[in-house]
């Protein structure tokens, strides 16, 4: 793969989308309580920090990309995701960005729709993003590292209001807390405060690494599916 030649390693295909593999594929930082918490409150994070499609001039995939759109839907089904809204933008380069999980939205750089594109690498990018949608980790994946701890602290204090996050201004935490509270649109399960306390006890000072960790999780899932280190290298570099 390092020389550009693909290794002969069969991938697991769409079986890699099975959430039962999460314990094996998720980095250590993404503990079981944190993954469970994201499953329950990740939609609120997406709502609190929406990706502005207008600012990047994103438009729906063109009609001539209908075949690719069908492939996206087929892959998404394996992740338990349906009716993916796919957009294209000239502003984001050769990448696929998971915008939100509810509704499920992906944004592609326009170069990924050009003729001659490496379709294997493009598929890798789609699979990686679909994993992040399945995990409800889209917002974490695209938040700047410097902002991750205030955002995560705000999320945790929604469910553990007496906890004081170290190393971040209380005013900033309160701002994020209110933003996330405003995006909660349904009653959450009774175990959410317990999960939040477990995350508080384990995350330490590593919140700024969460974006890297969730993207690693997506990369591992896509690599398992594809079995192609060359495609992974191209996709990760995008």
Where are these regions (language model features)?
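Hydrophobic or amphipathic, alpha-helical segments that drive membrane association/targeting
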Residues: 1-105, 111-116, 120, 135-140, ...
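A broad, structural surface signal
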Residues: 127, 220-223
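Short alpha-helical catalytic segment bearing the HExxH-like zincin motif
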Residues: 107, 121-129
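Short acidic, Gly/Ser-rich segments with clustered Asp/Glu that frequently serve as metal-coordination loops
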Residues: 130-134
